[in-house]
Swiss-Prot record:
Annotated localization: Cell junction, Adherens junction; Cell membrane; Endosome; Golgi apparatus, trans-Golgi network
Propeptide: 23-154
UniProt topological domain (Extracellular) ranges: 155-709
Keyword Transmembrane helix among record annotations: yes
Positions that bind Ca(2+) 2: 257
Protein name, per record: Cadherin-1
Tree of life domain: Eukaryota
Length: 882
């Protein structure tokens, strides 16, 4: 080969290498992973919700879920690609084909074909599952990294790694080895992350750091976690990532380690007696935690193991092997013979050849209306008083062979010949008896006896043609004394309110319904609140006993006066009927208009007008328009004007500025019929400005006496009376003439002197303190009869001291008070002493001699006896003989 040939070969090689180096990864193409999918189902009958398989669509956007659609409405495709059965499905052909559609991000439509194959139980193929046990593990390599934001090829998607559950070990066990192409360039270290690696459950999977062997460390449980998603990482010795993380999906394959479980221990159902074969009774349901998509480990089959009782046939019921629906298979169900059946049902997986469990199904045979109710007896009699409703006449007895308290047993009674609806039959829910009662009052005078025909049926119709039982009831009506009946019950009479007293208004009578009795009716008024009416007890004629008044708001409502009239017969017992008399009172012009309000207030400054409404108790035309006029000089200070066209109100305002005070305004009001009246308005002018509603009422102009002034005047009068009384007492005392205590000296000879005071003996230091009592305060009340007492001030006497040491001061002070006491003896009373000593030292009266000389008549010594004898000394001492 020449130099040119070698150069050309080198150039071609260089171009090939350059083309290989510049080649970009294959772009992502949207679409299904496969053009068709084939799924195998274990049986021709599929229940609702059965999972058939899964399709996968790649739309190159990274979305985890896709919207799928199928034209076959029997199947549903979820957003995760899982295909399920929408409703119970039965295969008529060995295969079913249908299309599944999906759309990419540009709304291009893609489709794939799905085929369902059914296989017989005897040659059922089990799905192939690649297990790592006993075979050489697969080698996984990292895909070539791409530059930029480009997706990897679809060929790089790692298929799921299958690992059986419940393996025995030994552990750890190799699953797969992960290799990086960069291990030729240097040392590469491997690690994994994700569920089962570094997130719970942690440590289920591990990877050898240098060799890349992915291992499982313990037995797996598919019922706990069915799929693990891991990410493998490759880094260089200096810690730099040499590969992009690679997703690894580990699927735990199922083992038949769970037996079916019934949703209930005891299932209860019911079926009517006489049900035909094929009638569904109930459904039992069991579940299995094993895989029901890829294996038969959860394919449950139902069977009936036993039936109790086995009569009238040991196979009265059958169960659907796939759905668990129990149905009647044989005729002869009779509630009266066998009311219940107990079935033991079994649920087994692997289509009935695997693990199994049992449950109980209790079937109750319900009653049908195949027995009619029958009267026993068929004839009845009863009595009822007339005019009484809801009265029990008699009780009807029936028997029914059907189940008690069921619609087929409950009786329904019908009266065949009660056209007037006068009777009713109700059913006693406890014993099914019929209770015949009156629906409304009966009239003895109209009919004395009723013969009723009553039929009985059930709540539900008869299942077969049966004869309806009937009974005959004879009802006798008893005559009672009925109350008289007013005709009409409510009588309306129009009368003028000025109807004369004592005149007859109307006649209101009642008739006696008891035509077979001769009775007398007496009338009287039961309610007459205004006491306006009186009635003739024999004829029922009603007349007035007082003047009527339509405007009496207490007794008249809407111009109507209501009175109650009663009529009483003389039967036994006495019966009374009631009638209502409505007197419609027509209006007369008997009320003059009046103002409202009658008390008003104005402000002194800038007063605002006040509106006065005109009220008339009469009715039109005896009311508005009204005429208003100020009288008795009120128009000098005030003015009025009408407030509305109908003249039903006026406006009052002052003509000029008025002084603060109270004013009386005479206002004359006249109605449309010239009925007038003068009313006095109380008007107050307040010390305010503007609206009078914000000011207080002014003080009255006239001076008046208030309570404090009255009390002051009374106090002054009382003080004046006391002063006059004291003055009179003082003048009376001045007018008293002093009379000598002793007769003149000429008449004193040979006479015995009488003294008012009898001394208590000589002074003695020995005295009894207990006799002092309370001092002079305890002196007796002895009143003089010869001299009228005068009103004088009394000196103050000290009370007896508790300390005996102070008794001397007590005596001295009270002696001084007694000396200055004008009421002291001898002018007021005789002194009374409780203790006068144990004897008298005075000489006998016979030793007293009459004095005959002037010396003996010397009374100057009386001046030495103190103040107590001063008056006596003044009268007898120092005097000259005339």
């Amino acid at each position: 080969m020449g130099p040119w040939s070698r150069s050309l070969s080198a150039l071609l090689l260089l171009l090939q290498v350059s083309s290989w180096l510049c080649q970009e990864p294959e772009p992502c193409h949207p679409g299904f992973d496969a053009e068709s999918y084939t799924f195998t189902v274990p049986r021709r009958h599929l229940e609702r919700g059965r999972v058939l398989g899964r399709v996968n669509f790649e739309d190159c956007t990274g979305r985890q879920r896709t919207a799928y659609f199928s034209l076959d409405t029997r199947f549903k495709v979820g957003t995760d690609g899982v295909i399920t059965v929408k409703r119970p499905l039965r295969f008529h052909n060995p295969q079913i084909h249908f299309l599944v559609y999906a759309w990419d991000s540009t709304y291009r439509k893609f489709s794939t074909k799905v085929t369902l194959n059914t296989v017989g139980h005897h040659h059922r193929p089990l799905p192939h599952q690649a297990s790592v046990s006993g075979i050489q593990a697969e080698l996984l390599t990292f895909p070539n990294s791409s530059s930029g934001l480009r997706r990897r090829k679809r060929d790089w998607v790692i298929p799921p790694i299958s690992c059986p559950e419940n393996e025995k070990g030994p552990f750890p066990k190799n699953l797969v080895q992960i290799k990086s192409n960069k291990d030729k360039e240097g040392k590469v270290f491997y690690s994994i992350t994700g569920q089962g690696a570094d997130t719970p459950p942690v440590g289920v999977f591990i990877i050898e750091r240098e060799t890349g062997w992915l291992k499982v460390t313990e037995p797996l449980d598919r019922e706990r976690i069915a799929t693990y998603t891991l990410f493998s990482h490759a880094v260089s010795s200096n810690g730099n990532a040499v590969e992009d993380p690679m997703e690894i999906l580990i699927t735990v394959t199922d083992q038949n380690d769970n037996k079916p479980e019934f949703t209930q221990e005891v299932f209860k159902g019911s079926v009517m007696e006489g049900a035909l074969p094929g009638t569904s009774v109930m459904e039992v349901t069991a579940t299995d935690a094993d895989d029901d998509v890829n294996t038969y480990n959860a394919a449950i089959a139902y069977t009936i193991l036993s039936q109790d009782p086995e009569l009238p046939d040991k196979n009265m019921f059958t169960i659907n092997r796939n759905t668990g629906v129990i149905s009647v298979v044989t005729t002869g169900l009779d509630r009266e013979s066998f009311p219940t059946y107990t079935l033991v049902v079994q649920a087994a997986d692997l289509q009935g050849e695997g693990l199994s469990t049992t449950a109980t199904a209790v079937i109750t045979v319900t009653d049908t209306n195949d027995n009619p109710p029958v009267f026993n007896p068929t004839t009845y009699k009863g009595q009822v008083p007339e005019d009484e409703a809801n009265v029990v006449i008699t009780t009807l007895k029936v028997t029914d062979a059907d189940a008690p308290s069921t619609p087929a047993w409950e009786a329904v009674y019908t009266i065949l010949n009660d056209n007037g609806g006068q009777f009713v039959v109700t059913t006693n829910p406890v014993n099914n008896d019929g209770i015949l009662k009156t629906a409304k009052g009966l009239d003895f005078e109209a009919k004395q006896q009723y013969i009723l025909h009553v039929a009985v049926t059930n709540v539900v119709p008869f299942e077969v043609s049966l004869t309806t039982s009937t009974a005959t009831v004879t009802v006798d009506v008893l005559d009672v004394n009925e109350a008289p009946i007013f005709v009409p019950p409510e009588k309306r009479v129009e009368v003028s309110e000025d109807f004369g007293v004592g005149q007859e208004i109307t006649s209101y009578t009642a008739w006696e319904p008891d035509t077979f009795m001769e009775q007398k009716i007496t009338y009287r008024i039961w309610r007459d609140t205004a006491n306006w009416l009186e009635i003739n007890p024999d004829t029922g004629a009603i007349s007035t006993r007082a003047e009527l008044d339509r405007e009496d708001v207490e007794h008249v409502k809407n111009s109507t006066y209501t009175a109650l009239i009663i009529a009483t017969d003389n039967g036994s017992p006495v019966a009374t009927g009631t009638g209502t008399l409505l007197l419609i009172l027509s209006d007369v012009n008997d009320n003059a208009p009046i103002p409202e309000p009658r008390t008003l207030f104005f402000c002194e400054r800038n007063p605002k007008p006040q509106v006065i409404n005109i009220i008339d108790a009469d009715l039109p035309p005896n009311t508005s328009p009204f005429t208003a006029e100020l009288t008795h000089g009120a128009s000098a200070n005030w003015t009025i004007q009408y407030n509305d066209p109908t003249q039903e109100s006026i406006i009052l305002k002052p003509k000029m500025a008025l002084e603060v005070g109270d004013y009386k305004i005479n206002l004359k009001l006249m109605d449309n019929q010239n009925k007038d009246q003068v009313t006095t308005l109380e008007v107050g002018v307040c010390d305010c400005e503007g609206v009078a509603g914000v000011c207080k009422k002014a003080q009255p102009i006239e001076a008046g006496l208030q309570i404090p002034a009255i009390l002051g005047i009374l106090g002054g009068i009382l003080a004046l009376l006391i002063l006059i009384l004291l003055l009179l007492l003082f003048l009376r005392r001045r007018a008293v003439v002093k009379e000598p205590l002793l007769p003149p000296e000429d008449d004193t000879r040979d006479n015995v002197y009488y003294y008012d005071e009898e001394g208590g003996g000589e002074e003695d230091q020995d005295f009894d303190l207990s006799q002092l009592h309370r001092g002079l305060d305890a002196r007796p009340e002895v009143t003089r009869n010869d001299v009228a007492p005068t009103l004088m001030s009394v000196p103050r006497y000290l009370p007896r001291p508790a300390n005996p040491v102070e008794i001397g001061n007590f005596i001295d002070e009270n002696l001084k008070a007694a000396d200055t006491d004008p009421t002291a003896p001898p002018y007021d009373s005789l002194l009374v002493f409780d203790y006068e000593g144990s004897g008298s030292e005075a000489a006998s009266l016979s030793s007293l001699n009459s004095s005959e000389s002037d010396k003996d008549q010397d009374y100057d010594y009386l001046n030495e006896w103190g103040n107590r004898f001063k008056k006596l000394a003044d009268m007898y001492g120092g005097g000259e003989d005339d």
